[in-house]
Amino acid sequence: MNKSFTLSALLVLFAAPAMADDLSKYQEESRTVATAFVTQLIGENKKAVMEGGPESAIKVCKEIAPKMAGDVSRKQGWKLTRVSLKVRNPLLGSADAWEQKVLMDFEKRIAKGEKPESMEFVEIVKEPAGNSFRYMKAIALQPGCVTCHGAAEQIPDAVKARLADEYPNDKATGYAPGQIRGAISIKRTL
């Protein structure tokens, strides 16, 4: 038997459990970071609404959330973003090809009855620059979020005016509570 083939086969055999352990570890770390990010974002939105009304939440999503994502990315050494198929800010929220595929898969899973609160996806992706661990956690629209992301009749006039001013090409409306608004996406180079 070819010695190099045997050595390669043994390396794969022994490396597979280690890779699975790493994948589970990365998934748990990513889940923890994504959950903390969403919890903090919801808290910031609630605080803004209490202090300045519903249109104040727009500033949270436009200015505070990207800063929070940048802070997490720098601290962890990963890239954390919020992505969607229906973006409000195409510069920050547009999904790449892999993220689009996962978001469409989330939609299929929700159609089959899976709860969005626990929906996530992980994969090791081979890219030109090397392998990356990719993680996504679905963001389900919360009841209070319809004020900015709901059907046209659910959005107050002051919020509509502010959205039209801030986001003239806004596509992030028409959602109902429980639908997937987007996802937290984490990418880390391996």
Protein language model annotation of sequence segments:
Residues 146-153:
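Detector for the c-type heme attachment site
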Residues 8-15:
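Bacterial N-terminal signal peptides
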Residues 1-7:
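Bacterial N-terminal signal peptides that target proteins for export
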Residues 21-142, 154-190:
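Extracytoplasmic c-type cytochrome modules immediately beyond a signal peptide or single-pass transmembrane anchor
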